[in-house]
Amino acid sequence: SQAVGKEVMAHAAKHLTPVTLELGGKSPCIVDETANIKLAARRIVFGKYLNCGQTCVAPDYVYCAASVKDALVDEMKKQIRKQFGDDPLANADYGRIVNEKHFRRLIGLIDPTKVVAGGVCDSALLQIAPTIMDQVTFEDAVMQEEIFGPILPVMTFHSLDAVISQINRREH
């Protein structure tokens, strides 16, 4: 969190200790109508679902031009199948959520009415299938904090300049 990062930086500064801070946040992928959809989908799926989204560099959500959103979502579904198989939870190479507390928090972020891929979980194994949520807004629970898990919200835009401005106005 930014609050903890400020505290760590203040203590490090007292002793001139060099530090690098990764403060988490809501890091979006922006896909406009000029993007190579297949390449974008492959990279987004790899980055998001590597280690079940539990990496500090994982994309947090996708902001996609409305005109290519359906194609992107369809291609991301294909990439999930290609990278993890038809049943990711049965794939020995697909990971688990770090602990039960984090698993429960993630499950609470999933709105079943917005799930277009995945959404399946196994509480005994602490696994959540790669999940894509569509028709997401900034008011949804999944957009209120860093996800740090295998849940990918998709939002659309009509103006690239407007979306960049909107992202820059929000806390990251």
Regions found by a protein language model. Name each.
Residues A124-A129, E145-I151, R170-H172:
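Conserved glycine-rich beta-strand-loop-beta hairpin in the small C-terminal domain of fold type I
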Residues V154-H158:
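Short acidic-hydrophobic, aromatic-tinged amphipathic segments that line or gate anion-handling sites
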Residues R96, L152-P153:
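Conserved donor-binding loops in enzymes that form glycosidic bonds
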Residues Q2-T137, S159-D161, S165-N168:
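ALDH superfamily catalytic-core signature
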Residues E139-Q144:
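Cytochrome P450 core scaffold surrounding the K-helix E-X-X-R motif
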